[in-house]
């Protein structure tokens, strides 16, 4: 099968297949157009498995002499796919006539026909046909047209590779051709042949013209780079001979050549100058290339370079160059560039990096783009990481980030507050600066979520004289108190205190002799133009009153919209501030004044929630929280005071410590995963050929070829680690008592499934047209229909079928085997093959904010009830993670201990980019150790299939655990 070329299957409608006699008549008597259509039809039928041995002579007699170019092209395809040998493997006699036709086409005056024929000869696998044509092929090397010459080189290359005895002097012939050739495409093909057939001649040619390499065309330069890489990898002593050539190719006009040259350079040399030159070349490619896919690929190469410790030290000086990539509009490119810069930055250039990021922040205020909000969030997180990693720059970063609090984009503002919360906890010296800017930005915040977080930070960290300042700022954004009376005055049209103050400031200079009303009435007169063009005056007193929509303060507006969660958070903050003020202020009257003021605000919120003015009433939970705050202020019991004064900050400190420990654990695992091979590790034979002392590492050409042949890298490694892995994936399709036995090995690759089906004829009869018919359910698609085979008695064969996968859903493959015997046609129904969703899901991680946002956005939810024999909460969680390939986002410290219940978030991504979220909520009685775990799992995904498939997987894993118990 390895000798059979690969074909492109052209789908044709299921019409009646014409018989051989009809095709012969059309080819004999039809005109040129009719012959073209008939020839196309014959080619499609041959590709679909039909056999017409009697047509060959008809085509030789009536079609081959036609000089039409379209027919010539179709004939090349026909001769490529038609069987050229008889049943005993001997060449058909008719092919001698075809060989003569090939020779005439190779001597045809039309250069396109010559070149097409030469390309066709590259695909022939019959040396008997090629041998008489060798003189004509050699003569084409001297043709005047470059199209003929370059295809002649390819033909000689292919023939030499397959049948070197047909052209024993091939390398010498092509080397002489290369010396006299001027066309770059011809030189490229000739050099490519020498590269694979005779590297010594290729090296001699390169050495003779190494100073002119920069003037060659890009197609030849790419082959030269490949040669240098292979030669230096096989013989590292040659590096010094060709490294200057690679340096010169870094300045090539072709981006492809520069990319390959940079990759080759860092494999040949780890000198700082080489690393810097290659990295700078990569960065220039990213900046100048417009294709985002190219940018991402080159960024991945830079990230791979950074993983090498020696290269990372050199690349640290290129941080500012990496930040030039931020000019790209694509958010993924920016995300990777910022992550790379963050890994490379160090104390010397952190200041410059922060300045660049500040400029990028300023740019986002003036640009409205689809991804502007995400980019702002990205910048905030990067500045956050910079400040935590290098505390010296935190003071300059905080004022820039606080400006984001007034942004309408909640994501960026929420990340700013997360940064502020961590900075104020870790750097107490900056608390004064942070609080000052936070109070200043507090009235401009536009989101209740951001206001809640800001209020919590202010209540937790404000001390001393700033307490009164914070309470004043809160009351200013809350409005008049009591709020119910203020809303009643607003509805009745009476001016509130705010409006009175505004009007008083506006008319403060008016005298009391009645001139104020005169001025007002005069200003209320409106000039109008009548139909005849004259002016008329209309008094404001004659106009109907127009309802004026008045804007409420932000916090008041949240409460009027029914969001009383902000009221509960506000009450907790005011309670903390009042308790802290009581500790600092010895004067009891001042204590009582502030406490009364704070309690009035809380009671006013409660009154407003039950008054009917807001769009939704206050909830019982928020009411209880506010009552607790009021009781704490009135009774001031030590336990309650400690909760408000100390426990909240301690909880934050523990959470940040847990996050830091988790980050360190992940970093150590990553370093352990990328560790070099240890002395006591088993050594694979593939590594023995290179040796561990080889600085050039693995040959990328060989590794990519091996990976392509073995499928995905993960599948290849799993087969090596477990020799029985393939046997575990064998699915029995029929019974042993069936006349035809079938079993299949399901090989799951990244985007397709390969079924290797073994079919055994268990009868004493010959089975004609034994066909494997398959169909699919779910998001699976059969790529091609397997061809029918003939099975002798007790014979067997292997049939492969490809199934394309385009999404993460459970799929089913079913079908039957149809075969003909001497008496009738029989059908054997196959067992169904279930495709496991777990082959396409990989664990992933995200932040809590991203998880909540996706949980809110995804519309499909699947709730699975826990039904298991497990009696331990942690064991069930581990079983769930193992059976779903998901990652637990909840920190280990938050899950430690036995308290009778557990809640955890889990996340995974598919290889198609789909996200899967899961929330586990389980419990069991603490006093009954033998009781089973109960609860439920909620799954959310963007697509219905993903949510249902993951739920089915969880349900099936639970059934297996119950049956095992």
UniProtKB/Swiss-Prot annotation:
Subcellular location per the Swiss-Prot or TrEMBL entry: Cytoplasm; Golgi apparatus membrane; Cytoplasmic vesicle, COPI-coated vesicle membrane
Membrane topology designation: Peripheral membrane protein
Keyword annotations of the record: Cytoplasm, Cytoplasmic vesicle, ER-Golgi transport, Golgi apparatus, Membrane, Protein transport, Repeat, Transport
**Example of a GO cellular component annotation carried by this entry:** Golgi membrane
Q: List compositional bias (Low complexity) regions by residue number.
A: 513-523
The HEAT repeats are found at 128-165, 237-273, 274-311, 313-350, 392-429
Q: Do the record's keywords include Repeat? A: yes
Q: Name one GO biological process term.
A: intracellular protein transport
Task: State the superkingdom.
Answer: Eukaryota
Q: Where is this region: Disordered?
A: 488-526
GO MF annotations, alphabetized: structural molecule activity
Family annotation (Pfam families): Adaptin_N (PF01602), Coatamer_beta_C (PF07718), Coatomer_b_Cpla (PF14806)
> What is the annotated role of this protein in its UniProt record?
The coatomer is a cytosolic protein complex that binds to dilysine motifs and reversibly associates with Golgi non-clathrin-coated vesicles, which further mediate biosynthetic protein transport from the ER, via the Golgi up to the trans Golgi network. Coatomer complex is required for budding from Golgi membranes, and is essential for the retrograde Golgi-to-ER transport of dilysine-tagged proteins. Required for limiting lipid storage in lipid droplets.
- Subunit comment for this entry? Oligomeric complex that consists of at least the alpha, beta, beta', gamma, delta, epsilon and zeta subunits.
Q: What name is this protein filed under? A: Coatomer subunit beta
Q: Which organism is it from?
A: Drosophila pseudoobscura pseudoobscura
Q: What is the lineage of its organism?
A: Eukaryota, Metazoa, Ecdysozoa, Arthropoda, Hexapoda
What gene, per UniProt, encodes this protein? betaCOP
